Amino acid sequence: MQNSTLYLQRLRQLLQMEYDSEKEDFRVQSEKMGIKRKIHRGICWYPVEAGRSYYNSLNQFVVEVVKKDHEEDEEDIEHLFEYGKPVQFFQTRAPYGEDTLAGGFPTGDAPKKDGFSYFSFSSTVSYVDGDRMVVTLPSSQALIDLQNATNLGLQLYFDETSYKTMFHALDDAINAKNNRLADLKDIFAGQLKPEKRTFTPIAFPWLNKTQEQAVNEVLWAKDVEVVHGPPGTGKTTTLVEAIYETLHRETQVLVCAQSNMAVDWISEKLVDHGVPVLRIGNPSRVNDKMLSFTYERKFESHPDYPELWSIRKTIRQIKENRKRGDNVHQKIARLRDRASEIEMAINAQLFDEARVVACTLVGSANKLLVRHKFSTLFIDEAAQALEPACWIAIRRASRVILAGDHQQLPPTIKCYEAMKQGLGKTLMERIVENQPDAVTLLKVQYRMNDDIMKFSSDWFYQGEVESDESVKHRSVLDLEHSIQWIDGKELTHPSPSLQGGGEISANEQTNEQGNCSLPIGRAGSGSSEFDFTEQFIGENHGRINKAEAELVLSTLKNYIDKIGKERFLAERLDVGIISPYKVQTQYLRQQIRKREEFRPFRQVISVNTVDGFQGQERDIILISLVRSNDNGQIGFLSDLRRMNVAMTRARMKLIIFGDKATLQHHAFYRKLIQYVERLKGE
């Protein structure tokens, strides 16, 4: 049994290691990385233009920043800018492409290094929509500086605030004694047993038995409950029902998640269920539906807001126009008192009307929530959240409900040593270990063909997850196997046409599975030999396997041909191509965009990393594992949770591309290869 305080003290040390490591990485990155690499990493916009400015409903001075002309190879880059992220503006001595530009770490007043000049102020992202970003500014002078700048850009800044908030939350939990926070700390550590209410179970005919059990367990729990939702088991449906039922007993609940996207998803489902939601912070997807329940939109839609806006404007005008010796302090003070009075009244009404307050875990430290306490906190996607972030929200609640799957994507951690020593262990995992009676596993999945699901169920969930009859035998083509493994190195007689970009016919070279014949496409590598060995790309040793990528593309094209173009488009079958390696996904995405044979299907083909597909599903999934070497090195493919996510995105067809000789050194991949071979022989 763990001592709860000692555990959290150790956790704080690990968080400090992560903080130090990430801050140093940011410093090195800023000093040594050129603009193009920053852009391709998704951490920089350049060039940009400062557009219109205004005061938003929170009385923050903001400016719209628009991304100007960018190169073709930048079109598919997924940027990392989102609400709440700190950013720093810079200008360059010469336009992009005319100088070799390295960075300069922004400290103090506009340091200059190798053509970079950083502005001395930092800003925060308010929201992002396509090529337009709205960021806060400290003053109108900052705007003038930006408008006068040439070759303007901005990049992500080190996120000091989030770390400070997590440290503060951990300190509160560590020092908690003889209060509710102290009780929860001891319960999570297994030092106290969680209590339950007793009342007759409620029937939910529209849920399955384990979903119904999970909702009842949430209602019975006095302290903590975990809803463990494997892929396709309806975790979100169950969680929404649990929140809805809880609101029959409580006035208001707090709903949090690690990411803005996850908060958006659960918020949207609750709104669809008729629940009044107040979203603190701006959504990751900017549309009218998502914005309609944000605090900022509701605030500025309030009938008293025009008066508040007018008072704020008057105060600014008085300050700007006053002359030396003018005594306007009393007038400004009276106006500020009236503005505060209106603002507090609007706040009170917005919170009174909301049944659910939704925000990220870090966002729960927002000053709007300072005086608010909640009977129940729901944390969605809890297995992706660092435990220190969870404590930020836990401080505001009397009981905690966590939902997620610790066999899927883990939290993102930069410091390997901190991860190895335990920072990667989530609060959800701790509770599952220390309080197994407070965990309900959802056991029926509604997504995958049974053959796709079964290996995942056996390896990750002790065989407890089963397929609903409605999906058990779903398939794209009759009499085909739903799961397939293709190894390019087993294709021993590549045609000379591979070197020139041609294709060989199915008769010349095929990989057979049942009656599904898959031709091998062009390698496009320009090498003298058709080589499926992985290659290193870039300063971070990103990995790419172009021959395997070409095999993926030709396999997909052949499979679409077997289905038939008319049927494929009429039924809107969708395809996901997944690779754990970002460079591989970029190459695949570029090829699909360039090649005419994919033009009719581009709208239904998605290419992304495993992280980019979390929570999604497709009819057809192709996975490119990339790794192929003589040493059996597989890198982070050994994090099996990522492979679990990748495989379980498929509804009807799963095709895995990988070098068996490299991968079968690992027990998981050896078993998976054997499983696929066994199905092939049936």
What residue ranges belong to the model's regions?
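N-terminal pre-P-loop "Q-motif" helix
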Residues: 203-223, 238, 359, 544
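Pre-ATPase regulatory/linker segments immediately N-terminal to the P-loop/RecA-like helicase/translocase core
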Residues: 2-10, 75-217, 272, 289-313
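A helicase ATPase "motif cassette" and its flanking acidic/Ser/Thr-rich regulatory loops
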Residues: 1-82
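Conserved P-loop NTPase motor core of helicases/translocases
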Residues: 198-199, 244, 252, 264-371, ...
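Intrinsic disorder/low-complexity segments
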Residues: 94-116, 492-530
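Conserved helicase motor core of SF1/SF2 NTP-dependent helicases
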Residues: 249-251, 259, 348, 362-493, ...
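Hydrophobic anchor at the beta1->P-loop junction of P-loop NTPases
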Residues: 227, 255
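Motif I (Walker A/P-loop) of helicase-class P-loop NTPases
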Residues: 236-244
